[in-house]
């Protein structure tokens, strides 16, 4: 069955239209890894492989690695035999590399490294990772492992306030997530294009609902109920704009037909934690295709879109419950957007 979207009636320039569940029938579910404990009470490290997309190039050996671990104190008191104090959980993204090594070899070598964790600040709170140790199977990721890396804390750390400044902290890895990049390419639309606004344009957004195997309310997420009565969480992303010349708008029904012809296919991966992969199997307009970098395989990382929801998916199974196309007027240029807002003592809002 070909993916399609149900028709929408639109007398305005806005509309919401659901995609058929067949468009995420293959690859719309990520299973969680069941923890195992050894005789000493420590978690046994595991790995899992994800293959989102159509797997057009099954043997190219390109893969994205992200590992998860406990942030714990380095010091240990030998005379008391106390276990190291666990402070929080963090994700350590390693990025893309090409390797023919067995996943177990990658995992064991990662676990043998000494990975340090430090809390600092710039425009936002940051987490700095450093690592040391011999590299063999992990040579394709040598740059990030030997040079260190820095991330916005909210994206990679569950409770950054628990990371101590007066003690050395280390990451004890317990899970390695491997996303095989087996399609003809993986492409993330540049932020400048995602923020592109234009008058007389219709913005093409996606509203994605996720069913997560967790108590959303305990995580501070209100959520909503799907048609089966399950609580789901949602996020929205921007794909591009339908632009018409001569100062006119396309109708929403016209845009819907354009989207229908694109025959979009959705799947989940583990780029940056959780990622939505979109494959364009049909026909796409030249202008919209240009906005997507002339790529038919797109990837959106939830780490960048909604880091709070992304952290919830780290150790829980997750599946797509619903995907809808949302058509809205593009925000006009005259609408002022402030990345930084300051308020003076008179209450006036000033541009930063």
Curated annotation (Swiss-Prot):
GO terms for molecular function: structural constituent of virion. Changing residue 93 to A: Complete loss of budding. A motif (Nuclear export signal 2) lies at residues 268-276. Keywords: Host cell membrane, Host cytoplasm, Host membrane, Host nucleus, Host-virus interaction, Membrane, Ubl conjugation, Viral matrix protein, Virion. Residues 1-22 are annotated as: Disordered. It comes from the Viruses. It holds the Pfam family Matrix_Paramyxo_N. A motif (Nuclear export signal 1) lies at residues 106-115. Changing residue 92 to A: Complete loss of budding. Ubiquitinated; regulates matrix nuclear export. It is found in: Virion; Host cytoplasm; Host cell membrane; Host nucleus. InterPro entries: Matrix_C (IPR042539), Matrix_N (IPR042540), Matrix_Paramyxo_C (IPR055413), Matrix_Paramyxo_N (IPR000982). A motif (Nuclear localization signal) lies at residues 244-258. GO terms for biological process: virion assembly. The keyword Membrane applies. One of its GO terms (cellular component) is host cell cytoplasm. Plays a crucial role in virion assembly and budding. Forms a shell at the inner face of the plasma membrane. Transits through the host nucleus before gaining the functional ability to localize and bud from the plasma membrane. Mediates together with fusion protein the incorporation of the glycoprotein to the viral particles. Also participates in the inhibition of the host interferon type I antiviral response by interacting with and thereby inhibiting host TRIM6. Homomultimer. Interacts with host TRIM6; this interaction inhibits the IKBKE-dependent activation of the type I interferon signaling pathway. Interacts with host ANP32B; this interaction promotes M nuclear localization. Belongs to the morbillivirus/respirovirus/rubulavirus M protein family. This is Matrix protein.
């Amino acid at each position: 069955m070909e993916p399609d979207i149900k028709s929408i009636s639109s007398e305005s320039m806005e509309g919401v239209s659901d995609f058929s569940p067949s468009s995420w029938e293959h690859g719309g579910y990520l299973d969680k890894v069941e923890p195992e404990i050894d005789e000493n009470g420590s978690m046994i490290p595991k790995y899992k492989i994800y293959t989102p997309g159509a797997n057009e190039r099954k043997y190219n050996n390109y893969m994205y690695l992200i590992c998860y671990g406990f942030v714990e104190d380095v010091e240990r008191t030998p005379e008391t035999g106390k276990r190291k104090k666990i402070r929080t959980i963090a994700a350590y993204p390693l990025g893309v590399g090409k390797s023919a090594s067995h996943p177990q070899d990658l995992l064991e070598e990662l676990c043998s490294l000494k990975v340090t964790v430090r809390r600092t600040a710039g425009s936002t709170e940051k987490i700095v990772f450093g690592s040391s140790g011999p590299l063999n199977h992990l040579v394709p990721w040598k740059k990030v492992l030997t040079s260190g890396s820095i991330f916005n804390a909210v994206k990679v750390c569950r409770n950054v306030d628990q990371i101590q400044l007066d003690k050395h902290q280390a990451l004890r890895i317990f899970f390695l997530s491997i996303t095989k990049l087996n399609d003809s390419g993986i492409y993330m639309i540049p932020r400048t294009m995602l923020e592109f606004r234009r008058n007389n344009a219709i913005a093409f957004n996606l509203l994605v609902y996720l069913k997560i195997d967790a108590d959303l309310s305990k995580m501070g997420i209100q959520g909503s109920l799907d048609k089966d009565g399950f609580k789901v969480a949602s996020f929205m992303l921007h794909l591009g704009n339908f632009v018409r010349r001569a100062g006119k708008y396309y109708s929403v029904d016209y845009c819907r037909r354009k989207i229908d012809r694109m025959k979009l296919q959705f799947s989940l991966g583990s780029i940056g934690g959780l990622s939505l992969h979109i494959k364009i199997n049909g026909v796409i307009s030249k202008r919209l295709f240009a906005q997507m970098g002339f790529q038919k395989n797109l990837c959106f990382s939830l780490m960048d879109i909604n880091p709070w929801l992304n952290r919830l998916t780290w150790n829980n199974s997750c599946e797509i419950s619903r995907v809808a196309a949302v058509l809205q007027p593009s925000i006009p240029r005259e609408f002022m957007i402030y990345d930084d807002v300051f308020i003076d003592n008179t209450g006036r809002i000033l541009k930063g």
